[in-house]
Curated annotation (Swiss-Prot):
SUPFAM superfamilies: Kelch motif, POZ domain. Kelch repeats lie at residues 176-234, 235-282, 284-325, 327-372, 374-429, 431-480. One of its GO terms (biological process) is proteasome-mediated ubiquitin-dependent protein catabolic process. Substrate-specific adapter of a BCR (BTB-CUL3-RBX1) E3 ubiquitin-protein ligase complex required for mitotic progression and cytokinesis. The BCR(KLHL42) E3 ubiquitin ligase complex mediates the ubiquitination and subsequent degradation of KATNA1. Involved in microtubule dynamics throughout mitosis. Its main location: cytoplasm. The gene is KLHL42. The modification Phosphoserine is found at residue 43. Induction: Up-regulated during mitosis. Keywords: Cell cycle, Cell division, Cytoplasm, Cytoskeleton, Kelch repeat, Mitosis, Phosphoprotein, Repeat, Ubl conjugation pathway. Coiled coil: none annotated. It comes from Homo sapiens (Human). It comes from the Eukaryota. This is Kelch-like protein 42.
Amino acid sequence: MSAEEMVQIRLEDRCYPVSKRKLIEQSDYFRALYRSGMREALSQEAGGPEVQQLRGLSAPGLRLVLDFINAGGAREGWLLGPRGEKGGGVDEDEEMDEVSLLSELVEAASFLQVTSLLQLLLSQVRLNNCLEMYRLAQVYGLPDLQEACLRFMVVHFHEVLCKPQFHLLGSPPQAPGDVSLKQRLREARMTGTPVLVALGDFLGGPLAPHPYQGEPPSMLRYEEMTERWFPLANNLPPDLVNVRGYGSAILDNYLFIVGGYRITSQEISAAHSYNPSTNEWLQVASMNQKRSNFKLVAVNSKLYAIGGQAVSNVECYNPEQDAWNFVAPLPNPLAEFSACECKGKIYVIGGYTTRDRNMNILQYCPSSDMWTLFETCDVHIRKQQMVSVEETIYIVGGCLHELGPNRRSSQSEDMLTVQSYNTVTRQWLYLKENTSKSGLNLTCALHNDGIYIMSRDVTLSTSLEHRVFLKYNIFSDSWEAFRRFPAFGHNLLVSSLYLPNKAET
């Protein structure tokens, strides 16, 4: 069996041996070169192997590409490391950082048109190289690699967003109608299947969707077609176990759980985010102030932690910096209030000041960092939940106490009600009530065409009055009951998240 014909690739004063057959198989550049019969491309030294001269490439990049070619384009085990240990090592005197090495590898692979290597890079996109790969894909016109990087950055959006290099790529759009890279990624996070998710200390039991194997899950997802709940497997951080009074909000399709207190200890400032794209929890920067029984609101791509137990200050979390900063405080400390975002501003309603009932609606403008008195109410409300659609705020549950001359009599001040407040017309509407259910200790989420409302605590001893699992349809102004409560449990939270489609996972 004859020895395989080798070719020497010369770059400056160094030569690299490579199989001629594999070179032609893997490199479109050399395949075209040999087929063309170009004399200047076929220089052979007397008595030695054929020599091909290359210019303008880097030695480390070329060596990695040729090692890949010599391996026959083998994909198994080929990983790009800081020094290219897989797919060919780099001499110690050529030690380089991964970004530089990656740049030179893509340059050489693109010049030599080694398509199989460029395709392999699609599976090598990582958090530490996705931004550089995206830049290189733009420079060398590699649409498949660019798309792979975009998909990866969508999945790991906040982790990518806080990297300094991101803002070099994410420059503002140059023409009207153009969308920035940041906006493209943010919009792509809102794709997939909208799913109702419940988080809590589930106990299983007769109300559980089915018997659990081992420990009950900490998160469940709701399947609307069958009206059943299923475990959403994830590793809940130990720091979140038995935490009460925390703030929660959805930002860029991440579920944030922030602050709170532990039954056996004091308040905490820790913050975590759940990424449904990876089904993983991440710890993010902690607040500057430990706080509990406060409101966490997402507005204009940031989070605002508002007030708390005997606390009036407000902090803003910017995921681009992974940092919290104090902003304008509440005019007064508030307790048992609620807050939500509406048309880019924050509205605070109800609760108590240190002296009396809070009858004011407060509005916070993030751009001016200023709180203003928006309106004064005739109805006092506390412990309510709030969500918004366009310019309308929906107030769910709570304990109502009417003070005006048109006070209406009701069977109970804490029955389950839904009211709306239009921030443009400043009109209140009393929409719906359920006199058999309590409006206290609830969690709710806006999901599809309605507001899903659940009790925070349900056990065998919980009365029917305090077992709530209802949907308020905002278009038909009607209640819709559900047959299945997720499970017995405490400290429950319901949210709406986009989960990846099965074909994407």
